[in-house]
């Protein structure tokens, strides 16, 4: 009995164990069926050592962190899975990976190795557990419980996923009753996607409604857009009221802002840094709010048209979302001044950049709409990469635009920072417009910049003193005496009467007998000249005052004991500079400097009694300057005629003849004896010796000024003629503004020649051609390329020294000329250098293409050369 019972119990236990094992196997099979993807990844996908090149490229693409350019480099070098561990940083940089892709590759590969090691450990543990499960019933029971729990968890996860998918289609945004609104007009758009204006029947409130066709875009993306737009709550972001849908369209309602954009406001009232700081500080807070959401929202097209003002003059950031990308500007006229919304631009936000569906929709919609006004360099990659850093780039360009330093044209070149900008603003612009997005600050970091703080108000007002600089009155009084003293000290005598006028004006403001006399003087300038000739004693006292001034100008010590003449001399000096064109009266006066020395005692008692002699002196003093004004006009006309004659004579004369004229100039100064006869004689007799002396003296300063201007222009031209490491400019100079392209160019090896011939054939250039290029246009583009090409190559190649290959020079020549001739369009330009040669030259060629596309040089070259303008400060 005992044996039977024991055997029966053992048999029962064995049967139970077999049943449990069968159940476990069934459960495992079910789990395997439910999780085929995970098991395949654990068994096959994560075994990277057995991957071929195609699997490696697929893995890099699935990471969504590595650019397509780097994936093509892995594909071109035929890197398989067993080589992944042996790739060092130096090798990756030489291959052409950027620093960002290198870091992304390292992090992704570390995760891959960890998963691979974990799967191996799991498989080993599972094998060991199977071995021990034959003898251990407890382990079987535990496995059964674990498998049951896993099944329940899988079922729960599936149910949750189904519930989430169903919930995603429900919009949380409030609905609006479209019947309560009356259609006014369609502002922008087409039949399938448009921007319309409505007004409420009761409240008369105007709203904007975006009408989006369901057939144009995926319904789930529209639902996500509307739900997230309605959830945004920020005082500086456009308010979305709700939505309405019918069988064919979605209607999204938002607030209407009639005050217009900051672009139109800046045209009427230009912004300085203090005012711009208040506006853009709030705009930056709105951007930071969008970037801090989970998932973050990326605006994608921040510009001056998308910053509006509400009724309280608060800035409002508008127009973002995938559903608005297809809006096109069909109606250019807008009666209600709302054309500044510009919803036709490409303003989008990316809720989750890690999803394939989102990226696909972004790329598709990107091809159907206009490009952003201020696109960052990474947007022009294939595929375009939008990120938070692209918003920072657009923000910096918009700020620079509102301050008046960028011309708002489709051609974009980042200019050199002007000197009038404050240091804090220069730092902000430099940081926000970095070529590599990795080095741009975040929105939170920008808010901590010194330019946005109150302490920067003093420094931000530094560029404003550029406007009040033109102050002619105070500056001329001080700046003009310097040239007068440098030219000759004899210019002072004819101007002291102005001193007597200038003195009584501040001292005796009530007595103004001079004003009626000034009206009479214009009618009697010749009489004054005749009276001055007939009455020698009168001009002597008038000239006696300046003569000590002339002696004072030559002798500084007597200036100290006479404070009054010093003040009087400071005022006539500007007039002397004005009368610098009058050489004849200036030269004869030093000859009389010996005579009026006793007359110096006369003006002193006159100064002691200013009440009596002053009314008599200003009469003669006013007559003289007025007569001088006419004389100046006459002399200027004579000088112009004489200059023309001299120019003709100089062309005919030889150099020794010009040397003879120099001693005549040296002798002309002591010859003139009468100061007042010289201006009267040159009128009827332009060919006398005295006139020749005057012409030589008058033309020399003008010639010097012309020479100085010419020298300055030459210096500016020399600054533009920058010789670079590229031999293109030298070739350009040797061929007299022409570049010769031929198939017989010299090459170091046959590979370069074949590569060059392939490129020429691709461009359609089979014979030798001589092509004319605008010199200024060519020089500006090359100077810009030279300043940024090295940095772009270093960014692409890594922190190593970049040596431009000789084939790069030749291909650069043909490429530039082909772009000017419009032999290459934008699409072929962005393909890269992979079609022009082998992998050894692909890197350097692609770098050049990449640089051109990122800096938007192709937009300049593909346009007409006349449309090319250097960016500068708006006037």
Curated annotation (Swiss-Prot):
- Protein's cellular compartments: Membrane
| SUPFAM superfamilies the record matches | Protein kinase-like (PK-like) (SSF56112), SAM/Pointed domain (SSF47769)
- All copies of the SAM domain together span 51-116
Designated name of the protein: Probable serine/threonine-protein kinase samkC
Renumbered residue ranges of the record's region Disordered:
1-47, 136-170, 331-362, 461-718
The cross-references to Gene3D superfamilies, in alphabetical order and at most eight, read: Transcription Factor, Ets-1 (1.10.150.50), Transferase(Phosphotransferase) domain 1 (1.10.510.10)
Q: Residue ranges under compositional bias (Polar residues)?
A: 1-12
Compositionally biased spans, kind Low complexity: 13-45, 136-168, 474-554, 565-581, 589-611, 617-653, 664-718
Annotated coiled-coil positions are: 135-162, 626-655
Give every Protein kinase domain span.
Answer: 181-452
Membrane-spanning parts: 842-862
What topology does it adopt in the membrane?
Single-pass membrane protein
Q: Which family does it belong to?
A: Belongs to the protein kinase superfamily. Ser/Thr protein kinase family.
Enzyme active site: 301 (proton acceptor)
Q: Does the keyword Lipid biosynthesis apply?
A: no
Compositionally biased, Pro residues: which spans? 555-564
- Which reaction does this chain catalyze? L-seryl-[protein] + ATP = O-phospho-L-seryl-[protein] + ADP + H(+); L-threonyl-[protein] + ATP = O-phospho-L-threonyl-[protein] + ADP + H(+)
Q: Which GO terms describe its molecular function?
A: ATP binding; protein serine kinase activity; protein serine/threonine kinase activity
UniProt biased composition (Basic and acidic residues): 654-663
InterPro entries for this protein: Kinase-like_dom_sf (IPR011009), Prot_kinase_dom (IPR000719), SAM (IPR001660), SAM/pointed_sf (IPR013761)
Keyword set includes Transport = no
For this protein, the Enzyme Commission number is 2.7.11.1
Keywords recorded for this protein, A-Z: ATP-binding, Coiled coil, Kinase, Membrane, Nucleotide-binding, Serine/threonine-protein kinase, Transferase, Transmembrane, Transmembrane helix
Give the CC-aspect GO terms: membrane
Query: Which Pfam family name is an example for this entry?
Result: Pkinase
**Residue positions binding ATP:** 187-195, 210
Specify the species: Dictyostelium discoideum (Social amoeba)
């Amino acid at each position: 009995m005992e044996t039977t019972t024991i055997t029966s119990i053992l048999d029962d236990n064995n049967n139970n164990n077999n049943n449990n094992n069968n159940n476990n196997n069934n459960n495992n099979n079910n789990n395997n069926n439910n999780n085929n993807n995970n098991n395949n990844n654990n068994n096959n996908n994560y075994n990277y050592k057995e991957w071929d090149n195609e699997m490696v490229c697929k893995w890099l693409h699935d990471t969504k962190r590595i650019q397509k350019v780097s994936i093509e480099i892995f594909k071109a070098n035929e890197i398989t899975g067993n080589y992944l561990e042996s790739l060092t940083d130096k090798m990756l940089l030489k291959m052409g990976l950027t620093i960002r892709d290198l870091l992304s590759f390292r992090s992704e590969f570390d995760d891959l190795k960890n998963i691979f090691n974990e799967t191996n450990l799991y498989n080993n543990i599972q094998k060991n557990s199977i071995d021990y499960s034959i003898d251990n019933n407890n382990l079987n029971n535990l496995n059964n419980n674990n498998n049951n729990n896993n099944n329940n968890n899988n079922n729960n996860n599936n149910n949750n996923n189904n519930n989430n998918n169903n919930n995603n289609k429900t919009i949380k945004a409030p609905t609006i009753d479209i019947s309560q609104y009356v259609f006014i007009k369609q502002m922008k758009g087409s039949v399938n996607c448009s921007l319309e204006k409505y007004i409420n029947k009761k409240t008369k409130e105007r709203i904007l409604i975006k009408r989006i066709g369901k057939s144009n875009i995926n319904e789930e993306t529209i639902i996500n857009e509307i739900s997230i737009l309605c959830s945004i709550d920020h005082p500086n972001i456009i308010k979305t009221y709700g939505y309405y849908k019918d069988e064919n369209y979605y209607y999204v309602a938002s607030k209407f802002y009639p005050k217009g954009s900051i672009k139109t406001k800046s045209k009427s009232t230009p912004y300085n840094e203090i005012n711009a700081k208040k506006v853009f500080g709030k705009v930056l807070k709105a951007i930071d709010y969008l970037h801090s959401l989970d998932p973050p929202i990326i605006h994608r097209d921040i510009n001056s048209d998308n910053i509006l003002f509400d009724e309280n003059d608060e800035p409002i950031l508008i127009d973002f979302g995938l559903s608005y990308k297809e809006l096109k500007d069909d109606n250019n006229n807008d009666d209600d001044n709302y054309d500044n919304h510009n919803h036709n631009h490409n303003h989008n936000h990316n809720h989750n950049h890690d999803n394939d569906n989102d990226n696909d929709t972004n790329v598709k919609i990107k091809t159907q709409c206009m490009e952003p006004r201020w696109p960052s360099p990474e947007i022009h990659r294939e595929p375009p990469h939008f990120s938070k850093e692209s918003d920072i780039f657009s923000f910096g360009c918009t700020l620079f635009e509102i301050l008046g330093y960028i011309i708002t044209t489709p051609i974009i070149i980042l200019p050199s920072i002007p000197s009038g900008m404050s240091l804090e603003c220069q730092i902000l612009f430099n940081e926000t417009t970095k070529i590599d997005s990795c080095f741009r600050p975040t929105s939170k970091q920008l808010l901590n910049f010194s330019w946005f703080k109150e302490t920067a108000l003093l420094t931000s007002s530094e560029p404003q003193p550029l406007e009040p600089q033109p102050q002619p009155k105070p500056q001329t009084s001080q700046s003009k005496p310097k040239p007068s003293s440098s030219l000759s000290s004899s210019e002072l005598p004819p101007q002291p009467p102005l001193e007597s006028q200038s003195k009584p004006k501040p001292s005796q403001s009530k007595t103004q007998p001079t004003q009626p006399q000034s009206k009479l003087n214009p009618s009697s300038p010749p009489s004054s000249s005749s009276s001055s000739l007939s009455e020698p004693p009168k001009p002597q006292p008038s000239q006696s005052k300046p003569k000590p001034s002339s002696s004072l100008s030559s002798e500084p010590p007597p200036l100290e004991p006479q404070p009054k003449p010093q003040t009087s001399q400071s005022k006539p000096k500007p007039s002397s500079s004005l009368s610098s064109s009058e050489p004849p009266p200036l030269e004869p006066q030093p000859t009389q400097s010996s005579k009026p020395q006793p007359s110096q005692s006369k003006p002193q008692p006159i100064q002691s009694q200013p009440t009596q002699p002053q009314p008599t002196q200003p009469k003669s003093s006013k007559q003289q300057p007025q007569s001088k004004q006419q004389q100046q006009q006459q002399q200027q006309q004579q000088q112009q005629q004489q200059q023309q004659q001299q120019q003709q004579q100089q062309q005919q004369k030889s150099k020794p003849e010009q040397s003879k004229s120099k001693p005549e100039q040296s002798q002309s100064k002591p010859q003139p004896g009468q100061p007042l006869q010289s201006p009267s004689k040159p009128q009827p007799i332009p060919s006398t010796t005295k006139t020749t002396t005057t012409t030589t003296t008058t033309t020399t300063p003008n010639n010097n000024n012309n020479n100085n201007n010419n020298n300055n222009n030459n210096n500016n031209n020399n600054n533009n003629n920058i010789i670079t490491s590229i031999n293109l400019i030298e070739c350009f100079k040797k061929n007299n503004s022409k570049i010769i392209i031929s198939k017989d160019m010299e090459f170091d090896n046959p590979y370069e020649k074949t590569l060059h011939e392939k490129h020429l054939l691709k461009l359609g250039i089979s014979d030798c051609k001589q092509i004319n290029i605008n010199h200024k246009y060519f020089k500006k583009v090359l100077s810009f390329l030279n300043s940024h090409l090295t940095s772009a190559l270093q960014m692409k190649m890594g922190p190593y020294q970049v040596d431009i290959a000789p084939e790069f020079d030749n291909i650069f020549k043909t490429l530039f000329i082909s772009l000017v001739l419009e032999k290459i369009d934008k699409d072929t330009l962005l393909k890269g250098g992979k079609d022009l040669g082998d992998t050894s030259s692909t890197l350097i060629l692609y770098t050049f293409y990449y640089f051109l596309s990122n800096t938007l040089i192709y937009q300049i070259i593909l346009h007409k050369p006349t449309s090319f303008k250097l960016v500068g400060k708006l006037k």
